[in-house]
Curated annotation (Swiss-Prot):
InterPro entries named among the record's database cross-references: Arg-tRNA-ligase (IPR001278), Arg-tRNA-synth_N (IPR005148), Arg-tRNA-synth_N_sf (IPR036695), ArgRS_core (IPR035684), DALR_anticod-bd (IPR008909), Rossmann-like_a/b/a_fold (IPR014729), tRNAsynth_Ia_anticodon-bd (IPR009080)
Name assigned to this protein: Arginine--tRNA ligase
PANTHER family, alphabetized: ARGININE--TRNA LIGASE, CYTOPLASMIC (PTHR11956:SF5), ARGINYL-TRNA SYNTHETASE (PTHR11956)
UniProt EC number: 6.1.1.19
UniProt family annotation: Belongs to the class-I aminoacyl-tRNA synthetase family.
Residue ranges annotated as motif 'HIGH' region: 121-131
GO molecular function: arginine-tRNA ligase activity; ATP binding
Reactions catalysed, as given in the entry: tRNA(Arg) + L-arginine + ATP = L-arginyl-tRNA(Arg) + AMP + diphosphate
Subunit structure and binding partners: Monomer.
Length: 562
């Protein structure tokens, strides 16, 4: 039982008509520690009990069993609970130290599978900074869901089909150099693609060539198939370098092409349900009752669209993974598309359509400017990660020039800084990226949290890594209590982040815990020889464990030394 549950349980004994869960939801955390650790507002009871909230608060407070609390006091319409710092703090520390790897875990998911569509770059194009958000938000959500006992399935739905590949093949036929492609695949292919698009203004026949090549690809022409497979293979090899740097694995790379032979079934099902209507030669589904535009399934030339392909993918994923939830971590600009996807599945009679969730996110800008991909102007993610690693290396050199594994730490700090900066922001907000700000060791940054963890590890090394087995642990003083209390809030933060698909809650939590620990460190002689030394070191160990765990949920490493 965590601290919030402890307070809710005490309230439930005097409010038996309300569940512990309902009471937990009503509890507030006072901003000022003088008002206690938890506050219970009584306004909502006034109508039912026909009494003023202040009177209700006083009457309830008199009935509450105060054992396990330092005190319970009334403040107007609120009942303020002060937890017993020494005993509750000791219990929190003991819980962390007993099983650090599983602290904060809970069985919210009951091993239910959750498919997560994330990253999904286009082959033969560089991964730009725009791909960072879907990739790291999706991965963090997967980690958080795993922590509450869901089974995440990371799906990289590659953009590996479409008329653009016909254009690329036409460009390669005209200007391609195999050796040049082998040397630098994605940038070279991107160069060809930009060239044919730029020159198509003066040479409209290039568009015709592109259509001809794509028609060959659709018809299974051996040369078109060979080029397509080669472009896909070299692109994926390049992407894997970035994914390895980010330390992200995928369970599936089934992209758009995988569903080429699975869309006819979708159209047949829609025909059987008599859902298709003709509109100017195209086939659509009327979604007026959902307040949505008609969903186009087949164009007048008989070709299918993204929605048809995504319907095929949705059916395949449900059959393959029997998911409890199916998430699509895609920019907010695609909200209408996923609303249509969900509505069409519902019209098809699939009750599991309510398991489909679009996880939108805001745009990313660089130094206050929008990032453009027109005419090849792409800010490449790999370049930004490498620049961040270099900057981290410089700062480590200044702070700790004798650090043994400086290159590895620089990579963990540099990459972690980029990931953390994205994830500390609420995902629906737009994010501005300024490299120099992102890699700072102070302020609301990833390196600040990593440095707090490394500081805790340094203290534990100096103390000879003591054993806490069998020790009676307590928490002494307000600053120590603020740290312990924050540690005790880890599980509820994880549960909320899982329910809201919001990794920023973990990012903000990690920053808050690091800040509380740094304040404690600044005002406490942790290694002083007295009867509280082991408890102080236990607090430091718990901070180290929980910061490492929180960073791991975000996909960020926690170096032991910096």
């Amino acid at each position: 039982m965590n601290e919030r549950q402890q307070v809710a349980s005490a309230l439930q004994k005097v409010l038996p008509n309300l569940s512990v869960e309902d009471l937990e939801a009503k509890l507030e955390r006072p901003k000022d520690a003088k008002n206690g650790d938890y506050a219970f507002p009584t306004f909502f009871l006034a109508k039912e009990l026909h009494r003023a909230p202040q009177v209700i608060a006083s009457e309830l407070a008199e009935q509450i069993d105060q054992s396990g609390f330092e005190r319970v006091v009334v403040a107007g319409p609120y009942i303020n609970f002060f937890l017993d710092k020494a005993s509750v703090g000791g219990e929190i520390l003991a819980a962390v130290l007993a099983d650090p790897a599983n602290y904060g875990s809970t069985d919210l998911g009951h091993q239910g599978h959750v498919t997560i569509d994330l990253s999904s770059p286009n082959i033969a194009k560089p991964m730009g900074m725009g791909h960072l958000r879907s990739t790291v938000i999706g991965n963090a959500i997967a980690n958080i869901l795993a922590k509450v006992n869901y089974v995440p399935v990371r799906i990289n739905h590659l953009g590996d089909w479409g008329t653009q590949f016909g254009k690329l093949m036409a460009a390669y036929e005209m200007w391609g150099d195999e050796a040049e492609v082998q040397k630098d695949p994605i940038n070279t292919l991107q160069k060809y693609y930009v060239k044919i698009n730029t020159e198509a203004d003066e040479h409209p026949e290039y568009d015709d060539l592109g259509r001809e090549w794509f028609a060959k690809l659709e018809q299974g022409d051996p040369e078109a198939q060979r080029l397509w497979k080669w472009f896909r293979e070299v692109s994926l090899q390049r992407f894997m370098k970035i994914y390895n740097l980010l330390d992200i694995d995928f369970d599936s790379f089934n992209g758009e092409a995988f569903y080429n032979d699975k869309m006819d079934e979708v159209v047949t099902l829609l025909e059987d349900k008599q859902l298709l209507k003709e509109s100017r030669g195209a086939e659509i589904i009327d979604l007026e009752k959902y307040d949505l535009n008609p969903a186009m399934i087949r164009k007048s030339d008989g070709s299918t669209l993204y929605l048809t392909r995504d319907l095929a993918a949705a059916l395949f994923r449900k059959r393959m993974y029997h998911h409890a939830q199916s998430l699509y971590v895609v920019g907010a600009e695609q909200s209408n598309h996923f609303a249509q996807l969900k509505a069409v599945l519902s019209e098809m009679g699939f009750t599991w359509s309510d398991q489909i969730h679009h996880i939108p996110f805001g745009l990313m800008s660089l130094n206050g400017k929008k990032m453009s991909t027109r005419k090849g102007n792409i800010i490449q993610l790999e370049d930004v990660l490498n620049d961040s690693i270099k900057l981290a290396r410089q700062q480590i050199e200044e702070k700790n020039p004798t650090l043994a594994n400086a290159d590895q730490v620089a990579e963990e700090v540099g990459v972690g800084a980029v990931i953390f900066h994205d994830l500390k922001n609420e995902r629906t907000n737009s994010v501005d990226f300024k490299l120099e700000e992102v890699v700072k060791f102070e302020g609301e940054t990833g390196p600040y949290v990593q440095y707090a963890h490394a500081r805790a590890e340094s203290i534990l090394r100096k103390a000879g890594r003591p054993s806490f087995e069998g020790a009676t642990l307590t928490v002494d003083g307000q600053e120590a209590w603020e740290v312990a209390k924050k540690i005790g809030q880890y599980q509820e933060t994880i549960v909320r982040a899982a329910n809201e698909y919001d990794p920023s809650l973990i990012g903000k939590y990690a920053l808050s815990l690091a800040k509380s620990f740094n304040q404690y460190y600044a005002h406490t002689r942790i290694l002083e020889e007295d009867d509280q030394k082991l408890s102080r070191l236990a607090l430091v160990q718990a901070v180290s464990d929980v910061l490492k765990s929180a960073l791991a949920l975000l996909g960020v490493k926690a170096p032991d030394e910096m």
